[in-house]
Amino acid sequence: MSTLQDQLDEITARTRELVQAERLAVGERAVEELFASGIEERILPVGSLAPEFALNDSRGRLVRSADMLALGPLIVKFFRGRWCPYCVTELEAWRELHGTLRERGVLMVAISPQTEQQNDFMVSQHALPFAVLRDPGCALAEKFGVAYTVPEYLREYYLSILINVPFVNGEASWRLPLPAIYVISPAGRVLFAEAHADFRVRPEPEEALAAATHST
């Protein structure tokens, strides 16, 4: 059975076959610059007290982290948007583990800066069984240390391939989160934290699930 990273690597391989080298170079430059910024070193580390949050789900209902943590450990997954095939593949991998999450008493939310309508499209199209929350302008992602601003040259590239981030997000900041995952204990402490400047690299869901399970 293929791992999540195997599936993501397949997306990368197909992209390299189909996309012109000069276009690929734009994305590579962005990844290199984001890594060089040191953002991976600034993510909220294990042992920290996680920021509390109250965000709307895809139907406009307010979801509070405190209410979920009262029921057990919480997995928080930050993702860029429904336009990102890597994010879609990762969330679908988590969908397949939803039964295991429930059996182990672990809750999960996915969080993006997309509008509620865009999140609702994603929930419906990919049959996501967990709440998908909106983080306007990546305000919460900033508190977790995983928010960044898309550089001008990458904005032009995105728009050229019909990825209109301001439209999808409903605001003009061009802020996105790193693809990040956190596990938070019922006491509000970070048990697991991983984020990568390279959006093509993601931890296996089982790693985060193991951290959540050990907290129960």
Task: Give each language-model segment a name.
Residues 90-143:
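Structural microenvironment flanking redox-active thiols in thiol-disulfide oxidoreductases
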Residues 48-49, 73, 176-178, 202:
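Short, small/polar residue-rich loop motifs at catalytic or cofactor-binding pockets
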